Amino acid sequence: MPPHKAESELTVSTPTRRVQAIVGLRLLEMLRDQDLPGEILEAEDPTQTMPRRLGLSDVVDRQIRTYQRDVKKGVRLADAEVLDLFRLIIRRPDGEEVFYGAGRLLASMERPSRWTRVVPQRVQYAVARGRVKRRLKRLFGRRVGGFGRGPFSVEGRALVFIESDPGGEACHFLSGFCQEILEQTGGGVVQVKHTLCQARGDDQCRWEGMFIDEPAEDIQSEADSSERVEAGER
C-alpha cells in the first residue's frame, strides 16, 4: 500500500479531538448535582426521578474522575463523545436545567474584571461579545456561531452542541453561557431570550441579551452618597 494512501485512511478513521475536556466534566458534574438522593421513594414518580438517579451511577462517577484527569493533562474530546453526553442529558426530565447550569459554569471559569462594570453599556456589550466569541472558540476548538444586529445577539445554524438535539433542549446551554457572561460584564440584572430556534422551525438559532438593571453595589454606593449629602445639608 502506498504511504500516502495509508496516511489518508488514518486521517479519515481518526476523529479530530477539538473540545476541551472541561466541557464533558461540567456537563457530568451538573448532571450529578441535579440528582436528589434524598427524594421520598413512596411519593416519587419513577418515570421522572429514575432517569435522574442514573446520574449517581458508578459509570458517571468514574467518567467524572477520568475527565478531571483529562483536564489536568490538557486532553481534548472528539465531537462524537461530546454529542453522546448531550444525548444522555436530553433523555432526562431536567435536561434543560443541566444544560443551562453547565453553560453558566463554563462561562465563569475566568475571574471577571470589575472595570467593565463602570464603563458605558455600549462598551459592556462589546466586551461581552468578545468574551463569548473567545471562550466558545477556546472550549470547542472552532468558531461557534456569530453575532447579528443589536447590542448582543448571538446567532448560528447547526451549532456543534445542538446537532444531537432536534427538540431544542440543548439550546439552554448557550442561554446559560450568555447569561453568565453578561452578568460578569455588567454586574447587574440581565435578561437573555432564545428568540429563534431551529427546533421550532426557524432557519437559525438566536439568543438576545440585555442589561436591565444596574449592579447592586453601584445602587448601594449611590444611596450611601445621597445619605452623606443629606446629612451635610442638615
Regions found by a protein language model. Give the residues of each.
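Active-site helix/loop of acyl-thioester processing domains in fatty-acid/polyketide metabolism
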Residues: 172-187
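Short, well-ordered coil loops that connect the C-terminus of an alpha-helix to the N-terminus
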Residues: 142, 187-188
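Alpha-helix boundary/interfacial micro-motifs
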Residues: 174, 192-193, 220
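Low-complexity, intrinsically disordered Gly/Pro/Thr-rich segments
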Residues: 188-197
